[in-house]
């Protein structure tokens, strides 16, 4: 009887393992079972391709640039990866079923969650832009805590990753917000992987490190605050505009790949610039997010924040494939983002 129980438990463990393999991203080591040499797999990992999905998503010319991998090997790798992760057509009903499994991470405000239909969506990029002191970084701090909550409380049951380009990340804010949700402060801090980015190349390299970390453990959220700050200083003038936009496009594409591979919610903050033209004489200068069309096309959902009275802030859904254009009021307090207390 005991032996039968052990066999059943062993079969259950095997089924759980199979289920994990089927639903999670495939580690790139699985290519070895398809005849790819361990040395070549190591070269893929060193190039930042830590999952089979990342190999499939990469253009062929990118794989050819990896030192020590020949053209014949690249073709063999692509063939093996494509069998594990087929990228063909699927029916809209299958896609709809997959979309129903997407998790929304609560923002901390019920009013804000209402216009977001549950919260920040996983598996896509959400851009938050606005002037200074409008709550972008405070919303990011709140999300770092709420993403660790259980699913039934609006969380993502995962860790958070924070790339800080402006030096505005404050761990003590996470402790204050954790108290609001009854979470253990030290555990919350331990579940946030933090990195300070010092230039645009460093910011891009951090994404390679992020991918290898996401293979090892479950992350629910990836924040880049701000995605564009370093581009404003590293590239100057119209002469470097083309190079800046190309570099930014590659960075945003890498972020989208992380969202696709690991199902994380990617949140990027963006700075704004005053748009001074003829109408500004009468209506005052209008603001617009920097990054141009490349930034607009890369973001799945765009949220504009602006200041209200005192600590009140207003969030507007500017563009989204599934959310209606709407506004919500929220408040910045010691507990992070909360509903406005009238």
Swiss-Prot record:
**Per its UniProt entry, which superkingdom is the organism in?**
Eukaryota
Q: Which UniProt keywords apply?
A: ATP-binding, DNA-binding, Nucleotide-binding, Nucleus
BP GO annotations:
chromosome organization involved in meiotic cell cycle; DNA recombinase assembly; DNA strand invasion; mitotic recombination; mitotic recombination-dependent replication fork processing; reciprocal meiotic recombination
Extract the InterPro entries matched here.
Answer: AAA+_ATPase, DNA_recomb/repair_Rad51, DNA_recomb/repair_Rad51_C, DNA_recomb/repair_RecA-like, DNA_repair_Rad51/TF_NusA_a-hlx, P-loop_NTPase, RecA_ATP-bd, RecA_monomer-monomer_interface
Cross-referenced Pfam families: HHH_5 (PF14520), Rad51 (PF08423)
Q: Which CDD domains match?
A: Rad51 (cd19513)
Q: Where in the cell is it found?
A: Nucleus
Q: Which family does it belong to?
A: Belongs to the RecA family. RAD51 subfamily.
Q: What does this protein do?
A: Binds to single and double-stranded DNA and exhibits DNA-dependent ATPase activity. Underwinds duplex DNA.
The protein's name is: DNA repair protein RAD51 homolog
Q: What are the leading ranks of the lineage?
A: Eukaryota, Viridiplantae, Streptophyta, Embryophyta, Tracheophyta
> Which gene is annotated as encoding this protein in its UniProt record?
RAD51
